[in-house]
Amino acid sequence: NLSVEVNGDIFHNLHLFANPIDKFRPSDKEIQRALKKKKGSNLIYFGPGVHNLPNDTLFVPSGTTVYIDGGARVYGNIFTEGAHDVNIFGRGEVHPDGRGAGVWVRRSKNVRIDGIVVSQLPIGQCDSVELTNVKSISYYGWGDGMDVFSSSNVILDGVFCRNSDDCAAVYASTQGFKGGSNNVLVKNATLWADVAHPIN
């Protein structure tokens, strides 16, 4: 991961990310089944191009994989809400219409997210969530990267955060989430806080 800066200007720089080989990309057959909405497909696929979510929102059901392909830019919010066994993979981007979280993981269990680029990715009242090779970039106030609220067994591995607030913060009961947080691991991470703290 590189930051290309001209004359020391860190606010108008270019971020270059080198990704590992994508081992989660679905087969062409699986993609075609998803695009045709064939019965039995548990894949939601976003191909290269711009995608505007209906009502700016996608709630991911349990047992579903969302794949955001390289070159895809999804506008809106992707939620796992009260779900389990959810995967969000890819090399594309998710951005809300304006400020806020591109992906929200709430009251869910067994969620894995790999490779995508988001504005923010908070985790609230969850168990067993793993983020690998995820990039979070925000430029606005209160633009925390990957906050963890009242959650257990959370791994942030190989993530990159460039945020205009805390990059990663761990909280107990707050913002409508109840309970403590435990077994939260941040490793192999690059945390670049323009404001506030890399870890709070």
Task: Show where each model-derived region lies.
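Beta-strand-enriched, solvent-exposed domains that form extended recognition/catalytic surfaces
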Residues: 1-32
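An acidic-aromatic substrate-binding cleft motif
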Residues: 22-48
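Short, T/G/N/S-enriched strand-turn elements that build extracellular solenoid repeat scaffolds
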Residues: 31-37, 52-61, 75-82, 102, ...
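N-terminal extracellular ligand-recognition/capping segment immediately after the signal peptide
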Residues: 41-80, 92-94, 118
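Right-handed parallel beta-helix
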Residues: 63-65, 70, 84-95, 109-119, ...
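Conserved mixed alpha/beta catalytic, RNA-binding, or beta-rich assembly cores of soluble enzyme
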Residues: 77, 146, 185, 197-200
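Glycine-rich phosphate-binding "P-loop"
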Residues: 97-103
